[in-house]
């Protein structure tokens, strides 16, 4: 979010996010000294939300509506700092962030869930994937974590080369450059595919929160 800008309006919260916040406060009151197992806690909240009536949910939906109005109002008056964000993500040739172990797991299991539950919404699919992931043992998660670690390693090499190339090109535009960059782009194709899946998962996670 607005990492370096403390004046940026706080993001709007969904009805489900307000519900989770309420659950968390209830839990703190009942068990002030116990720590929360987030995977277990999220699962319980999700199950409880599904069983709630429209009337029970309406309270949280009203809270979300008023928070959205607050956010829209604040965003109208918000002026982002000069050179913020916009300049950062402009270069399409920059190496893309590698997917996490969870995103790799999602891209592998999502087609199966979609075929088993064709009418399932994007948000519910993401919830189901989150539940499946939290039920995996450390041994089951290992292959995804190893693959994610390799992709991260590759990304770190690519980003270092990309930055070095940027510095070099700032000083000179040599004709020998394109050959080197062509070699770089081939392995990046694979990474782009992974990244597309990651973006899709991130969208799903956002929808899940709403």
From Swiss-Prot:
* Record-level GO BP terms: chemotaxis; defense response to Gram-negative bacterium; defense response to Gram-positive bacterium; DNA geometric change; DNA recombination; DNA topological change; double-strand break repair via nonhomologous end joining; inflammatory response to antigenic stimulus
Q: Which InterPro entries match?
A: HMG_box_dom, HMG_box_dom_sf, HMG_boxA_CS, HMGB
Q: What one GO molecular function would you report for this record?
A: double-stranded DNA binding
List where Basic and acidic residues composition bias occurs: 52-76, 107-117, 137-150, 162-172
Record-annotated DNA-binding residue ranges: 9-79, 95-163
Cystines in this chain: 23-45
Q: Where is this region: Required for chemotactic activity?
A: 165-180
The segment annotated Disordered runs over: 52-150, 162-210
According to the UniProt record, list the residues that bear N6-acetyllysine: 3, 30, 43, 90, 114, 141
Q: Is Metal-binding among this UniProt entry's keywords?
A: no
Keywords assigned: Acetylation, Chemotaxis, Chromosome, Cytoplasm, Disulfide bond, DNA recombination, DNA-binding, Immunity, Inflammatory response, Innate immunity, Nucleus, Oxidation, Phosphoprotein, Repeat, Secreted, Transcription, Transcription regulation
Q: What does this protein do?
A: Multifunctional protein with various roles in different cellular compartments. May act in a redox sensitive manner. In the nucleus is an abundant chromatin-associated non-histone protein involved in transcription, chromatin remodeling and V(D)J recombination and probably other processes. Binds DNA with a preference to non-canonical DNA structures such as single-stranded DNA.
Q: What is this protein called?
A: High mobility group protein B2
Which species does this protein come from? Sus scrofa
Taxonomic lineage is: Eukaryota, Metazoa, Chordata, Craniata, Vertebrata
